[in-house]
């Protein structure tokens, strides 16, 4: 599954993308399969722990799989209830992050107007919408950042005059090297700037 797709608007019918004047890249945020998976697993596990704690207190079996009424409420049932509560709080955070699509957005490069726009969704509040705009003339290069090891990092950055580097790729699982190089080369060619970091 590709997290960042590139769509050229205004392509010519014969497939030549050189006629395109707008480049739009969709960036996947927290609505990834792995986040749905972990939110579901944590919700199920935490619900089981909480129901086991409540069952040991009420001496009524609320679970299908096992009979937690045999547990002594203090300390086992109480601890299971606390674990369940903590797990449900974590699951709530994961589900809210998915609902809000944290980190999702797009990169828009328009040669007609000479502007770029980087848009991302953040946490609710006054900074919910994160927008960065600049002129295409101010772009110095497209930079590829590759760091291997236990915590690998593979990302594309836009180097803009008078600003710090602007990240263009998603946060989370790193892109493959081939995909990163292809996206970087395509963007550098579109903007007419050098590609750094290879």
From Swiss-Prot:
Question: What functional role does this protein have?
Answer: Seems to be required for the assembly of the photosystem I complex.
Query: GO CC annotations?
Result: photosystem I; plasma membrane-derived thylakoid membrane
Where in the cell is the protein located?
Cellular thylakoid membrane
Please indicate if the UniProt record lists Cell membrane as a keyword: no
Residue ranges of the TM segments: 38-58, 78-98
Q: Could you identify this protein by its name?
A: Photosystem I assembly protein Ycf4
Q: Please give, as recorded in its UniProt entry, the membrane topology of this protein.
A: Multi-pass membrane protein
Chain segments annotated as coiled-coil in the UniProt record: none
Instruction: Cite the entry's keywords alphabetically.
Output: Membrane, Photosynthesis, Thylakoid, Transmembrane, Transmembrane helix
Q: Give the family per the record.
A: Belongs to the Ycf4 family.
GO biological process, any: photosynthesis
The protein's matches in InterPro entries, at most eight in alphabetical order, are given as: PSI_Ycf4_assembly
Main location class: membrane
Gene name?
ycf4
State if Transmembrane is listed as a keyword. yes
Instruction: Enumerate the residue ranges of region (Disordered).
Output: 1-20
> What NCBIfam families does the annotation carry?
PRK02542.1
């Amino acid at each position: 599954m590709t997290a960042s797709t590139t769509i050229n608007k205004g392509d010519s019918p014969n497939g030549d993308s050189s006629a395109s004047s707008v480049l739009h890249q969709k960036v996947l945020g927290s609505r990834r399969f792995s986040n749905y998976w972990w939110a579901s697993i944590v919700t199920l596990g935490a619900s089981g722990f909480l129901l086991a704690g409540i069952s040991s207190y009420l001496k009524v079996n609320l679970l299908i799989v096992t009979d937690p009424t045999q547990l002594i409420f203090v300390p086992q049932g109480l601890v299971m209830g606390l674990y369940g509560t903590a797990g449900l709080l974590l699951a709530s955070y994961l589900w809210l992050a998915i609902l809000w699509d944290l980190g999702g957005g797009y990169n828009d490069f328009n040669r007609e107007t000479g502007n770029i726009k980087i848009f991302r969704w953040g946490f609710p509040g006054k900074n919910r919408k994160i927008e960065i705009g600049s002129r295409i003339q101010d772009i110095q290069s497209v930079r590829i950042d590759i760091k291997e090891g236990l915590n690998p990092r593979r990302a594309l950055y836009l180097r803009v005059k008078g600003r710090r580097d602007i990240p263009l790729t998603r946060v989370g699982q790193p892109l493959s090297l081939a995909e990163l190089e292809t996206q970087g080369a395509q963007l550098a060619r579109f903007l007419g700037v050098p590609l750094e970091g290879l």
